[in-house]
């Protein structure tokens, strides 16, 4: 069964709704140099992460410029896993992996030239549609067939993101057969505020896709 991460959770009410809906992971954005309504301050990030129950994964989503910056944020917030957008080279990602106990998800574009190098140092790859600043959450889809090629050719788990909604996630899972799917803007009533009904429909539609999708 395909796993589901709901990203850009900004408060405890949305966190609890995401957990109740059956999502496998809660994404908390902190430490990104881009303008997004989904980023929270350090204290809020700690509070959200601390309240994620057992068997659901809290994921700190960040764009660090140095390994030390990443380690500092991780030590303070104590997430279960880390998602790194932009900023770190494959070698730096490997150095980070050696300094923390959490799994690292590296965000890449499907045609990134260093994708195999990132796959070597990350525990999973998240394939997203990114903007000029390297941030995700664009609401735009990309070439799902290219991402399917990565599923077939790489040994690390592939997470599909970018423009997913309750309406298209079943088709996306059937096409790509990813380890997991990730959504932010596709289940919002406004920037940074989750539509709880949409979250529930997204989780159901992702997990009810044909069994061949994992």
From Swiss-Prot:
Pfam families named in the record: PRAI (PF00697)
**UniProt xrefs under InterPro entries:** Aldolase_TIM, PRAI_dom, RibuloseP-bd_barrel, TrpF_fam
Say if the entry is tagged with keyword Phosphoprotein.
no
Which EC number applies? Answer: 5.3.1.24
The Gene Ontology terms for molecular function here are:
phosphoribosylanthranilate isomerase activity
Keywords annotated in UniProt: Amino-acid biosynthesis, Aromatic amino acid biosynthesis, Isomerase, Tryptophan biosynthesis
Pathway(s) annotated for this protein in UniProt: Amino-acid biosynthesis; L-tryptophan biosynthesis; L-tryptophan from chorismate: step 3/5
What this protein catalyses is: N-(5-phospho-beta-D-ribosyl)anthranilate = 1-(2-carboxyphenylamino)-1-deoxy-D-ribulose 5-phosphate
**EC category name:** isomerase
Q: Name one GO biological process term.
A: L-tryptophan biosynthetic process
Q: Which family does it belong to?
A: Belongs to the TrpF family.
Protein name per Swiss-Prot or TrEMBL: N-(5'-phosphoribosyl)anthranilate isomerase
- Organism encoding this protein: Haloarcula marismortui (strain ATCC 43049 / DSM 3752 / JCM 8966 / VKM B-1809) (Halobacterium marismortui)
The top of its lineage is: Archaea, Methanobacteriati, Methanobacteriota, Stenosarchaea group, Halobacteria
Which gene name belongs to this protein? trpF
């Amino acid at each position: 069964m395909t796993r589901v991460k709901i990203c850009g959770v900004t408060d405890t009410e949305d966190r609890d709704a995401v957990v109740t809906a059956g999502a496998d992971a809660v994404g908390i954005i902190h430490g990104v140099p881009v303008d997004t309504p989904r980023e929270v301050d350090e204290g809020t990030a700690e509070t959200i992460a601390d309240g994620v129950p057992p068997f659901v994964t809290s994921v700190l989503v960040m764009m660090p410029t140095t390994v030390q910056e990443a380690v500092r944020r991780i030590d303070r917030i104590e997430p279960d896993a880390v998602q790194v957008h932009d900023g770190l080279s494959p070698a730096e990602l490997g150095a980070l992996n050696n300094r923390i106990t959490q799994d690292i998800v590296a965000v890449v574009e499907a045609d990134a030239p260093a994708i195999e190098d990132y796959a070597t140092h990350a525990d999973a790859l998240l394939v997203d549609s990114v903007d000029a600043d390297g941030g995700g959450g664009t609401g735009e889809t990309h070439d799902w067939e290219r991402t399917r090629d990565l599923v077939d050719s790489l040994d690390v788990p592939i997470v599909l993101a970018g423009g997913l909604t309750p309406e298209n996630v079943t088709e996306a899972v059937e096409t790509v057969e990813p380890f997991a799917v990730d959504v932010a803007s596709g289940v919002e009533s406004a920037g940074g505020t989750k539509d709880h009904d949409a979250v529930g429909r997204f989780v159901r539609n992702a997990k009810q896709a044909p069994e061949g999708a994992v």
